[in-house]
Amino acid sequence: MDILVPNKPKYRSLCMCFHCHSAQASLDGGSSVKALVKRSKELGRRSATLTDHGQMGGLAELYEESMKAGLTPIHGVEIYLMSPWEPPKIYKNGKEEPATCHMTVLFKTQKAYEYFSSLTPIAHERALIKYGDMKPLLTWEELQEIGNEIVLGSGCYGSAVSKALKAGNPELAEQIYQQIRSIVSPESFFVEVMPHILDQKWIRPEYDKVSKEIIKSGMFVPNDLDECGSPIDLQKASNQFMVQMARKYKDPIVISEDAHVAVEDHKVVQDVRLGDNWRFSCSYSLEPTEVWADSLMKQMPDITSRDIEEWVDNSYKIFEQFRGYKFLTSKNRHLLPTMESVYNVSSDTSSVQHLKKLIVETGRFPKDPEKAVIYSERLKEEIRVLTQLGYDFLPYVFTVHDVCIAMRERGYLANPRGSGCSSLVLYLIGVSIIDPIEWKLPFSRFLNEGRVKGGSFPDIDLDISIREVCLDYLKAKYQDNMALISTDVAMRLKLTIREVERWMFGKVRSSTEDVLDDMPFVPQGVSDLHFLFGYEDESTGEHVQGFLESGSQAAEKLKNYIETEKEIWEVVLACSGIPKTRGVHAGGVVITPVPIQSIIPLTKVNDQLATAYTMKWVEYVGGVKFDFLGVKTLESLSHSFKAIQENLGVVFD
């Protein structure tokens, strides 16, 4: 009996992807961090890497997903460097714009992570906006400063070396190469060879009308043609030069995928996200070594199988440099403001002592002996839960108290909503106007021992009549220790259908608009798939009817669209839920005992700095969210109270 033996791969798997982008940062990423980690695992790799363009917002998620998958997370960033080797571009109006180049940086230590995170505010202040994407800029000197803590790659087609080569100056290209490799130790510099056939880097929207129509139909126009009209592989010359330099200076070479999608099928998501900004002409996905070996050996006929094996082996050498990397999360720390930063008190004063002082000053503790016993027992239990279960949550309470009192002193209404009103502590120090004992509200609605042991923090939503005043107060008080929290603005169902049609046809067809006009919007907090097909309610276990099950005329229209436009619908499902842009959390801010950018990278959203991590990942790395919500109804009430006081002499507490 013949035994079938599966074909053994010619090459072992790459240990890691040296250069990888996600949909979490710039528009040219087409896959989620989770999908990239999953693909790395499928390919038999030992690690997952993320080096988004100028952004670090996906690094916490990469760490979590990698740990769950049993992979080593490798953090990094592809920086936009203000090139010291090129003159600035000068426009007709006299405005100067610095020349930029790309460089791949991997963090060997937590110190490197914190260093690049700390530079995110200034990098975003210098940022260029190009074709809808932001390019935060760093300087050569800032890169040199951290050389001992990083692994450095020679970069992609947008690197300084490749740009000098493209400009026809190989001498300058070699000088730049020498300078770059000198920043780090020899074992921490790797020459990147890109296994892509790059017949064009991208298509820009300013091309003529004919080119635009070709782009919209999914085809591509080569930027460069040889004499016979065949596309020139722009990457080929760069790779050949890099290999030449590596051999001359005895530097290790690594196959650098520059992945922008996990699998080739995700490229359509990348295209839809980019819209008319530009379109990659080939798929930058994570692939088996054999695929890249074939590509590189076709590009460079002098490359042998032994070269490929050596380059694969180098990926394992890189991996070894990250075994000791430690990334701090909420398992290691909780970054609450200190009591001393909230109030002008001595560090010798305990949080419980200061709480009792506030209670006395507020004067809400009952003087009746019988009531005092009841209140004392409840207060004792609340203090136990807040301070004696492994955490001291009173600095969180004090921060909210300080904001609440400051807003009221300035003439603005402020009061907690929801479960926070179940806390006697909040009532006794003057934050809440609701006496939870009088209204029979149990403290367990707000916080209990089980929740604390499960890792939950107290969550006080403070409603304020004018949020901007509150934010100004927080910025003045905490300065770099406070930041807004960003949100992902995902591609939801209606938007996704429109974006996909614009990508495929250059416009949204009128028949499709007719379908969309009758569709309700997906409710907040409900996924597109749950909205369409229904879901099981977690609290009741009952099936919640989906829109397509409703039998309405609008639902039947959408059903017909799905049946007749199957190709479009597949793309819609692939894109749905992928971030399209960034927003700012309606109420959330994070306040820490140290400058935020040293632990949480920042980004620019609508011309204001906010955390590059969304709320889930801010809390994952130990940040604590405070909710200060602007409520227009309170502003209206405030005006009403003032009018009543002025006209009737009635004063409200």
What residue spans do the PLM features occupy?
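Alpha-helical scaffold/interaction cores of sigma-54-like transcription cofactors
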Residues: 2-653
